[in-house]
Amino acid sequence: KKLSFFVLAFLCMTVLVAQPTLKIDYSRPGPEIPKSMYGIFFEEINHSGDGALYAELIRNRGFEEHVFISGCEYKAGFVYAPQSPNYITNKLSNWRHPWDIEKLKYTAWKLNKNAGEASYAVVDENRLHPATPHSMRIDIEKTGKEGTVDLVNEGYWGVPVEKGEKYDLRFYVRKSEKYKGGVTARIVSSDDKILAEKKFQIEKEGWQEFTSVLKTSGTDSKASLQLCFDAPGTVWVDYVSLFPKKTFRNRENGLRRDVAQKLADLKPAFIRWPGGCIVEGATIENRVKWKETLGDPMTRRGEWDLWNYRTTMGFGYHEFLQFCEDIEAEAMFVTNVGLSCRFRNGDYVDESQLPVYIQDICDAIDYAIGDGTTEWGAKRMKAGHSKPFPLKYVELGNENWGVRYT
C-alpha cells in the first residue's frame, strides 16, 4: 500500500510540472554577431593531424614511437614525471603513464619473412640525424620463397591510395658490407596485388636517401607500403615517408585535400593552433616547442602527445600559418607560459625563467610577421615565404588559472 501511495504521489507531481516552452520573436532580432567570432580550433587529438589533416601516409615513419615523454623517466612499465608542486594545489604531483616499450617500437610495422630467415629490431646505432636517432635494423640470413624479406608499414589503419594517382616516396637505407642486393619499394593492396613499385640499388655503406614518384594501378583504403630486400646481410632503414602528390594547394609537406577543403568550406575567421592541453604538456618539458616544428620534417624530433600517441609535428608552425593564408583565415597562436597541464603533472618554471618564454613568444611573432631584417623573420623568408603571414592573435596559455598564472 505504501508503494502504491508513493507511485501515485510521484505521478501527480509529474502531471503538475509545467512543460517548458521556447518562444522566438522574429520581430525583435538581437545584435548581429560579427563573423570574426567564428573560428576553428586545431589540436593533435584522436589523430586529427597525423592520420587525418596532415597528408603523411606512413605511421611511425622515424621509428621513434617508443621514445619517452620529455621530462619523464621509465621504471617497471611506467614513465614517471619528476615530483614537483602542482601550480594550482601546491601538492607534490605523482603523475605517471603506462609505457609498453616493445609494443610501441613496432607501431604500424611488421616483417614478412616469406619463409626466409630474418629478424628485425628498432635500434639506436649509426644515427641518420639527431632528431631521428632510432632506425630499423634487419638481419637477413636467407631470403624466402619470394626472393625477398619485406619490411611492411600499415599506415594509419591502412595506406589509402587511389587508382592513377601519384605518391611521393622518400626513405633512407644503409647496408653492411655483406649486403650486395637492392631494395624495391612497393605499394601493395590488401589482397596482395602490387599497385606500384620501384627498385633501387644500394651503392654505399653509409646512409643513402631514396626518392621516387609512385603511380598506383588500383584503389585500396587498406593498402600497405613494403620495402623488399633481396640478399643476405644487414640493412638499416629510417625515415620512411609517402605523400599524395596532390595536397591542398599542392603544398610540399602539405595537407590532405579532402579534409583541408572541408575546413576551408567552413570559412573560419581564424584558426587556433597548436591546441589546448598539448600546449601545456604533461610536463613542462613535454610542451609544444614551435621552433622544433620548422624545417625538413625529417629533422623534426616530434613529441609524445598527452592524448596518448607520438606526433610527428609535421603540421607545424609554418604549415599552420600557410594554411591560414591559403583559406584567408587569421592565425591564433597559443603559447606556453611556463605551466604544464594542471590535470597531469602541473609543474611550472620559476619566475626567473620567464624571460626565456617571453622571448619565445616574441620570436614566434617575428617569424610570422617580421620584415626579414630580424632573426626569425629572416628564417621565414629563407623558408620561402617573403610576405608576412596573417598572425593576428597570441593567446597566453591554455585553460590556465590561479595566482601563478596571473
What are these regions (language model features)?
Residues 319-330, 387:
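A structural motif corresponding to the C-terminal end of an alpha-helix
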Residues 315-318, 322, 358-362:
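A structural signal for well-ordered alpha-helical segments within the folded catalytic domains
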Residues 19-312, 330, 345-355, 362:
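Extracellular and organelle-lumenal recognition/adhesion modules and their flexible linkers in secreted
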Residues 46-47, 276-280, 337-341, 398-403:
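Solvent-exposed loop/turn segments at secondary-structure junctions
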Residues 338-339, 346, 380-382:
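Short linear capping/connector segments at secondary-structure termini
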Residues 331-335:
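Hydrophobic beta-strand scaffold residues
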Residues 356-363, 367-378, 382-406:
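Active-site neighborhood of glycoside hydrolase catalytic domains
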Residues 1-20:
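Bacterial Sec-dependent N-terminal signal peptides
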